[in-house]
Protein backbone atom coordinates (compact mmCIF):
# COMPACT_ATOMS: atom_id res chain seq x y z
CA UNK A 1 0.00 0.00 0.00
CA UNK A 2 1.11 3.53 -0.70
CA UNK A 3 3.18 5.19 1.96
CA UNK A 4 4.36 1.94 3.50
CA UNK A 5 2.53 2.85 6.72
CA UNK A 6 3.19 1.36 10.13
CA UNK A 7 -0.11 -0.44 9.64
CA UNK A 8 1.34 -2.15 6.57
CA UNK A 9 4.41 -3.22 8.56
CA UNK A 10 2.14 -4.72 11.22
CA UNK A 11 0.07 -6.49 8.58
CA UNK A 12 3.17 -7.96 6.94
CA UNK A 13 4.47 -9.34 10.23
CA UNK A 14 1.09 -10.83 11.03
CA UNK A 15 0.89 -12.39 7.57
CA UNK A 16 4.17 -14.21 8.15
CA UNK A 17 2.67 -16.31 10.93
CA UNK A 18 -0.93 -16.75 9.88
CA UNK A 19 -2.66 -19.05 7.42
CA UNK A 20 -1.41 -17.04 4.45
CA UNK A 21 2.15 -18.17 4.94
CA UNK A 22 1.81 -20.78 2.22
CA UNK A 23 0.56 -18.13 -0.21
CA UNK A 24 3.55 -15.94 0.61
CA UNK A 25 5.89 -18.89 0.03
CA UNK A 26 4.29 -19.47 -3.38
CA UNK A 27 4.76 -15.80 -4.30
CA UNK A 28 8.41 -15.80 -3.33
CA UNK A 29 9.10 -19.06 -5.17
CA UNK A 30 7.37 -17.69 -8.27
CA UNK A 31 9.57 -14.59 -8.15
CA UNK A 32 12.69 -16.78 -8.03
CA UNK A 33 11.57 -18.77 -11.05
CA UNK A 34 10.83 -15.64 -13.07
CA UNK A 35 14.10 -13.95 -12.07
CA UNK A 36 16.08 -17.02 -13.13
CA UNK A 37 14.25 -17.17 -16.45
CA UNK A 38 14.82 -13.49 -17.19
CA UNK A 39 18.45 -13.17 -16.10
CA UNK A 40 19.91 -16.67 -15.81
CA UNK A 41 20.25 -19.11 -12.94
CA UNK A 42 23.53 -17.85 -11.44
CA UNK A 43 22.73 -15.58 -8.46
CA UNK A 44 26.21 -14.04 -8.59
CA UNK A 45 25.56 -12.82 -12.13
CA UNK A 46 21.86 -12.02 -11.61
CA UNK A 47 21.23 -9.47 -8.80
CA UNK A 48 17.45 -9.78 -9.15
CA UNK A 49 17.66 -13.53 -8.60
CA UNK A 50 20.06 -13.10 -5.70
CA UNK A 51 17.67 -10.67 -4.00
CA UNK A 52 14.67 -12.94 -4.66
CA UNK A 53 16.52 -15.85 -3.04
CA UNK A 54 17.60 -13.72 -0.08
CA UNK A 55 14.05 -12.50 0.44
CA UNK A 56 12.73 -16.07 0.33
CA UNK A 57 15.31 -17.25 2.85
CA UNK A 58 14.41 -14.40 5.21
CA UNK A 59 10.82 -15.64 5.06
CA UNK A 60 11.94 -19.21 5.88
CA UNK A 61 11.11 -20.71 2.49
CA UNK A 62 12.76 -24.18 2.49
CA UNK A 63 16.04 -24.34 0.58
CA UNK A 64 14.75 -27.23 -1.56
CA UNK A 65 11.86 -25.08 -2.78
CA UNK A 66 14.22 -22.23 -3.57
CA UNK A 67 16.64 -24.41 -5.49
CA UNK A 68 13.92 -26.15 -7.50
CA UNK A 69 12.43 -22.79 -8.48
CA UNK A 70 15.85 -21.54 -9.57
CA UNK A 71 16.39 -24.64 -11.70
CA UNK A 72 12.92 -24.48 -13.25
CA UNK A 73 13.47 -20.87 -14.21
CA UNK A 74 16.93 -21.41 -15.65
CA UNK A 75 15.86 -24.51 -17.58
CA UNK A 76 18.08 -26.87 -15.59
CA UNK A 77 14.92 -28.69 -14.54
CA UNK A 78 11.64 -29.26 -16.37
CA UNK A 79 8.28 -28.04 -15.15
CA UNK A 80 8.56 -24.27 -15.29
CA UNK A 81 5.40 -22.28 -16.03
CA UNK A 82 5.02 -19.57 -18.64
CA UNK A 83 4.47 -16.68 -16.22
CA UNK A 84 3.38 -13.25 -17.39
CA UNK A 85 2.88 -10.04 -15.43
CA UNK A 86 -0.51 -8.34 -15.75
CA UNK A 87 -1.52 -5.09 -14.07
CA UNK A 88 -5.20 -4.57 -13.28
CA UNK A 89 -6.59 -1.18 -12.33
CA UNK A 90 -9.58 -0.32 -10.20
CA UNK A 91 -11.12 1.62 -7.37
CA UNK A 92 -11.80 0.41 -3.87
CA UNK A 93 -14.28 1.68 -1.28
CA UNK A 94 -14.34 5.46 -1.05
CA UNK A 95 -12.82 5.78 -4.52
CA UNK A 96 -9.38 4.65 -3.36
CA UNK A 97 -7.21 4.08 -6.45
CA UNK A 98 -5.75 0.58 -6.74
CA UNK A 99 -3.23 -1.25 -8.89
CA UNK A 100 -3.28 -5.05 -8.66
CA UNK A 101 -0.16 -6.71 -10.02
CA UNK A 102 -0.52 -10.36 -11.02
CA UNK A 103 1.99 -12.98 -12.07
CA UNK A 104 0.02 -15.70 -13.77
CA UNK A 105 0.11 -18.56 -16.25
CA UNK A 106 -3.61 -18.18 -16.96
CA UNK A 107 -4.76 -14.69 -17.92
CA UNK A 108 -8.48 -15.56 -17.91
CA UNK A 109 -8.34 -17.08 -14.43
CA UNK A 110 -6.48 -14.08 -13.04
CA UNK A 111 -8.94 -11.59 -14.52
CA UNK A 112 -11.96 -13.50 -13.22
CA UNK A 113 -10.56 -13.97 -9.71
CA UNK A 114 -9.47 -10.34 -9.36
CA UNK A 115 -12.81 -9.04 -10.64
CA UNK A 116 -14.72 -11.32 -8.26
CA UNK A 117 -12.69 -10.19 -5.25
CA UNK A 118 -13.18 -6.54 -6.20
CA UNK A 119 -16.94 -6.67 -6.79
CA UNK A 120 -17.64 -8.70 -3.64
CA UNK A 121 -15.75 -6.24 -1.43
CA UNK A 122 -16.87 -2.81 -2.54
CA UNK A 123 -14.45 -2.31 -5.41
CA UNK A 124 -14.80 -2.04 -9.16
CA UNK A 125 -12.47 -2.58 -12.10
CA UNK A 126 -11.32 0.31 -14.29
CA UNK A 127 -10.05 0.66 -17.84
CA UNK A 128 -6.33 0.41 -18.47
CA UNK A 129 -4.66 3.77 -17.95
CA UNK A 130 -7.52 5.34 -16.02
CA UNK A 131 -5.86 4.66 -12.65
CA UNK A 132 -2.20 3.97 -13.37
CA UNK A 133 -1.48 7.60 -14.26
CA UNK A 134 -1.91 8.37 -10.56
CA UNK A 135 1.14 6.22 -9.73
CA UNK A 136 4.82 6.20 -10.67
CA UNK A 137 7.36 3.40 -10.70
CA UNK A 138 10.05 3.80 -8.04
CA UNK A 139 13.00 1.86 -6.73
CA UNK A 140 12.59 0.81 -3.11
CA UNK A 141 14.88 -0.67 -0.48
CA UNK A 142 13.50 -1.81 2.88
CA UNK A 143 15.80 -2.26 5.86
CA UNK A 144 15.23 -3.30 9.45
CA UNK A 145 16.56 -0.60 11.74
CA UNK A 146 18.51 -2.59 14.31
CA UNK A 147 21.45 -0.35 15.26
CA UNK A 148 21.29 1.54 11.96
CA UNK A 149 20.77 5.30 12.20
CA UNK A 150 19.09 7.45 9.58
CA UNK A 151 22.27 9.53 9.23
CA UNK A 152 24.37 6.44 8.50
CA UNK A 153 21.84 5.27 5.94
CA UNK A 154 21.69 8.66 4.23
CA UNK A 155 25.47 8.80 4.08
CA UNK A 156 25.52 5.42 2.33
CA UNK A 157 22.83 5.98 -0.29
CA UNK A 158 22.56 9.67 -1.17
CA UNK A 159 25.42 9.68 -3.67
CA UNK A 160 23.99 6.53 -5.26
CA UNK A 161 20.80 8.34 -6.26
CA UNK A 162 18.50 7.91 -3.26
CA UNK A 163 15.73 10.51 -3.32
CA UNK A 164 14.16 9.94 0.07
CA UNK A 165 14.62 7.96 3.28
CA UNK A 166 11.47 7.31 5.32
CA UNK A 167 11.34 6.19 8.94
CA UNK A 168 8.57 3.63 9.53
CA UNK A 169 9.29 2.82 13.15
CA UNK A 170 11.01 -0.55 12.92
CA UNK A 171 12.07 -0.13 9.29
CA UNK A 172 13.68 2.38 6.98
CA UNK A 173 12.48 2.78 3.41
CA UNK A 174 14.76 4.19 0.71
CA UNK A 175 13.14 5.46 -2.48
CA UNK A 176 14.93 6.26 -5.72
CA UNK A 177 14.45 6.44 -9.47
CA UNK A 178 14.28 2.94 -10.94
CA UNK A 179 17.44 3.65 -12.95
CA UNK A 180 19.34 4.14 -9.68
CA UNK A 181 18.02 1.04 -7.93
CA UNK A 182 21.02 -1.18 -8.59
CA UNK A 183 23.32 1.67 -7.58
CA UNK A 184 21.53 2.02 -4.25
CA UNK A 185 21.72 -1.75 -3.79
CA UNK A 186 25.48 -1.75 -4.37
CA UNK A 187 25.94 1.25 -2.07
CA UNK A 188 24.19 -0.62 0.73
CA UNK A 189 26.36 -3.67 0.15
CA UNK A 190 29.56 -1.61 0.10
CA UNK A 191 28.55 0.05 3.37
CA UNK A 192 27.88 -3.35 4.93
CA UNK A 193 24.22 -2.49 5.48
CA UNK A 194 21.88 -5.48 5.28
CA UNK A 195 18.55 -4.94 3.55
CA UNK A 196 15.30 -6.90 3.53
CA UNK A 197 14.38 -6.20 -0.07
CA UNK A 198 15.40 -4.12 -3.08
CA UNK A 199 12.77 -3.96 -5.80
CA UNK A 200 10.64 -1.83 -8.08
CA UNK A 201 7.31 -0.66 -6.65
CA UNK A 202 4.53 1.77 -7.47
CA UNK A 203 3.97 4.92 -5.44
CA UNK A 204 0.95 7.19 -5.73
CA UNK A 205 1.51 10.78 -6.82
CA UNK A 206 -1.09 12.04 -4.36
CA UNK A 207 -2.08 10.09 -1.26
CA UNK A 208 -5.62 10.24 0.12
CA UNK A 209 -5.97 10.11 3.94
CA UNK A 210 -8.40 7.50 5.27
CA UNK A 211 -10.24 7.28 8.56
CA UNK A 212 -10.53 3.98 10.41
CA UNK A 213 -13.87 3.04 8.81
CA UNK A 214 -12.62 3.49 5.25
CA UNK A 215 -9.26 1.89 6.04
CA UNK A 216 -11.03 -1.23 7.35
CA UNK A 217 -13.10 -1.52 4.19
CA UNK A 218 -10.04 -1.17 1.98
CA UNK A 219 -8.13 -3.63 4.18
CA UNK A 220 -10.89 -6.20 3.73
CA UNK A 221 -10.68 -5.77 -0.04
CA UNK A 222 -6.89 -6.08 0.06
CA UNK A 223 -7.20 -9.28 2.11
CA UNK A 224 -9.61 -10.71 -0.47
CA UNK A 225 -7.28 -9.83 -3.33
CA UNK A 226 -4.35 -11.20 -1.37
CA UNK A 227 -6.12 -14.57 -1.30
CA UNK A 228 -6.07 -14.71 -5.10
CA UNK A 229 -3.22 -17.02 -6.08
CA UNK A 230 -2.15 -14.92 -9.05
CA UNK A 231 -1.94 -11.62 -7.15
CA UNK A 232 1.62 -10.60 -6.30
CA UNK A 233 1.35 -6.98 -5.15
CA UNK A 234 -1.39 -4.47 -4.36
CA UNK A 235 -0.81 -0.72 -4.44
CA UNK A 236 -3.21 2.03 -3.33
CA UNK A 237 -3.20 5.79 -2.96
CA UNK A 238 -4.56 5.54 0.58
CA UNK A 239 -2.56 6.90 3.49
CA UNK A 240 -3.20 5.93 7.11
CA UNK A 241 -2.18 8.07 10.08
CA UNK A 242 -0.34 6.60 13.05
CA UNK A 243 -3.51 6.94 15.11
CA UNK A 244 -5.65 5.05 12.60
CA UNK A 245 -2.91 2.44 12.17
CA UNK A 246 -2.83 1.86 15.92
CA UNK A 247 -6.61 1.46 15.99
CA UNK A 248 -6.54 -1.04 13.14
CA UNK A 249 -3.71 -3.00 14.74
CA UNK A 250 -6.03 -3.72 17.66
CA UNK A 251 -8.67 -5.30 15.41
UniProtKB/Swiss-Prot annotation:
An example molecular function term from Gene Ontology annotations: DNA binding
N-terminal signal peptide: none
Region (Disordered): 56-79
InterPro entries, alphabetized: Integrase-like_N (IPR017856), TACO1_YebC-like_2nd/3rd_dom (IPR048300), TACO1_YebC_N (IPR049083), Transcrip_reg_TACO1-like (IPR002876), Transcrip_reg_TACO1-like_dom3 (IPR026564), YebC-like (IPR029072)
Pfam family name, one: TACO1_YebC_N
Keyword flag Plastid: no
Record key words, sorted: Cytoplasm, DNA-binding, Transcription, Transcription regulation
Disulfide bond residue pairs: none
An example Gene Ontology CC term for this record: cytosol
Location within or outside the cell: Cytoplasm
UniProt GO BP: regulation of DNA-templated transcription
Family per record: Belongs to the TACO1 family.
Protein name in the entry: Probable transcriptional regulatory protein cu0933
Amino acid sequence: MAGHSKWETTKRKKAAIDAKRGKEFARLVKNIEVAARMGGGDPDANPTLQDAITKAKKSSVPNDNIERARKRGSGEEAGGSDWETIMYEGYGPGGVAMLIECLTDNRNRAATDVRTAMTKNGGNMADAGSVSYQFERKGQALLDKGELTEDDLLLAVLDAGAEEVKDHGEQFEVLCDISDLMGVREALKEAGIEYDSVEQVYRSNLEVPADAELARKVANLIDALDDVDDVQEIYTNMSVSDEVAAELAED
